[in-house]
Amino acid sequence: MERKTVYIAGLGLIGASLALGIRRAHPEIEILGYNRSEESRQVALERGMVDRVTDDFAAFAPLADVIILAVPIKQTIAFIKDLAELDLKENVIISDAGSTKAEIVAAAEKYLQNKPVRFVGAHPMAGSHKTGAKAAHVTLFENAYYIFTPSSLTKPGTLEEMKDLLSGLHARFIQVDAAEHDRVTSQISHFPHILASSLMEQAAAYSQEHELTQSFAAGGFRDMTRIAESEPGMWTSILLTNPQAILERLEDFKDQLDKVAAAIEAKDETAIWEFFNRGRQSRKQMEIHKRAGVDSFYDLFIEVPDEEDAILGI
């Protein structure tokens, strides 16, 4: 690949990990970074993720051959508007890393249509409840889906260039329509986060009268609610940019709960057994057992005896 300049706006977990992956495959590329947080900028520089950093988004944009917007969705749309007013390189590729796609693609087609640029929406489906450049890792995207949602501004050759640029991620590239992306992720990503936060809120309220709730919360409860630690601002933005699909998932779930409640009330042993068995069989058939990368960070618990030098044996 010829020497290029890549500008990553947003040096959080996703943006910083993208920088590491690009650096791994293409050490010759100049990587510029934007972030409002001085701490994230310093971490990115110290770890060699980027060559130069700025807290002024417009400063590096005209220098870039590729611009990746790795910021919250509303900020991504605002930056797209800003890019429309800047003197960018001809044929520059603009992409993003947002968790919803329809509004972002629509914004690009609206504001960038008269610019000599190429735009392709993208969603790297990997992450963690941990945040910031300090949590970034070069293996974050390994075997995870990296979804491209092309637009009317995605000219021939754009996807191939992006796949080559991002080859160091070792991700699984796939192309999907933006609207279909938002429908599918409402089920397997957005709704589960609502459920995890709801479970935590319910448990917290319940523990006010039943103190043992917190003591007994382990195992399955911990696994189901881990993602409730995710950054609230990001998830607020996701829900507000994919409302219809998410509301439909919530209605579906209400219906499911009503059916389970009716079976319990009727003491319908067969219906209850079939409910759990359907869930069990569906889980076995899904690919979640076969893929890595989607949740690349885990909490590791080790029992250490309370004695001198015990930790040295780990």
Tell where the protein language model's regions lie, with residue ranges:
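NAD(P)+-binding Rossmann beta1-loop-alpha1 motif at the extreme N-terminus of oxidoreductases
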Residues: 1-62
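Residues at the starts of beta-strands that form the adenosine-phosphate
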Residues: 5, 30, 118, 145, ...
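Rossmann-like NAD(P)-binding element
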Residues: 58-88, 92-93, 99
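Rossmann-like NAD(P)(H) cofactor-binding subdomain of soluble oxidoreductases
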Residues: 81-133
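Internal alpha-helical scaffold of NAD(P)-dependent oxidoreductase catalytic cores
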Residues: 140-227
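Interdomain hinge/lid region at the active-site interface
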Residues: 209-278
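A conserved regulatory-domain signal marking ACT and ACT-like small-molecule sensing domains
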Residues: 288-314
